Amino acid sequence: MHSSKCPDLANIGRRRVLAGIALAMTTSSTRAQRLDAFPSRPITWVVPFPPGGAVDAIARIISRKMSESIGQQVVVDNRAGSGGIIGSDLVAKAPSDGHTILINSTGLVVDRFFYPRVPYQSDRDFVPVVLAATLPSVLVVPADSRFRDITQLLKAARENPGKLSFASAGLGTSIHLASALLAARANVELLHVPYRGSSPAVSDLVAGRVDMMIDSVTSQRQNILAKRVRALGVTSLDRHPQLPEVPTIAEAAGLPGFEVLTWCGVFAPKGTPRSVVERLNAEINKAIAAPDVVEALKQLGIKTAGGAPEVLADLFKSETERWQKLIVEYRLNANQ
């Protein structure tokens, strides 16, 4: 009669549990090491607009400073088109490891209101990293324009509905929205001429092919000083320190409370680990606090911001609510 020993199921189960714990600890440790090693290769910072604009300048100045301390090069990659959608979509579809990040502004909030098919959901497919900077814009006309002030411009617009044109850097960009909001608040009809970025729009403005443009002080200050364009009003509630002689649109046009500020936020793809977001946040905060970065941006009329990721998240939410309300209230659309 043969005897056989039954296997000790309790011991086998215990060994499997211990092996599973060991494997989980090893995997967790390996993952932690990978996160601690971030960044492990150069970081691509996507600017969804052409070179030469304010958003591009902000990214380039900050990226140079970041490259000195983060252990890898931070490379700016301009991916312009569709008011910022092409570049933003590239980041939305990038691996969520923090090596591809985005800088964008109001367009990321409102693009779904102006374009029939946006390939991402801006409130779900991006993780806020940090609010980098804010800056006001300025309404400018060609140097030889017949308009000496904003009241003359608005009077002509009322007398010639749809005849006066304004340039923008694309549908849904902050400078498009500023002009559309001005037209709506002043009860005038303007012709919208969208361009693929600020630079070609400015070229046509200087050449007199369009009547006006609201653009960042950063992009227009040198043109104003060189008298290639004439400034009629700034979009902030207070006069700009670098353009003290230029009135606010609120005061010059008699539109109390008129204010449109461009904010520039940094975003990562959805699913980016919190530790990576916090590292990026810390590095960008450190960069924008550096005196040379503060001074370089100040010379361009840009005010650094900073703070925790939640600061940008709260701003994104409030800006979405604000512009959604304004778009409905004033019936803003792509043609305005």
Curated annotation (Swiss-Prot):
One of its GO terms (cellular component) is periplasmic space. It is found in: Periplasm. Transmembrane segments: none annotated. It comes from the Bacteria. Residues 1-32 form the signal peptide. PANTHER family: BLR1237 PROTEIN, TRICARBOXYLATE-BINDING PROTEIN. This is UPF0065 protein in tcbD-tcbE intergenic region. It comes from Pseudomonas sp. (strain P51).
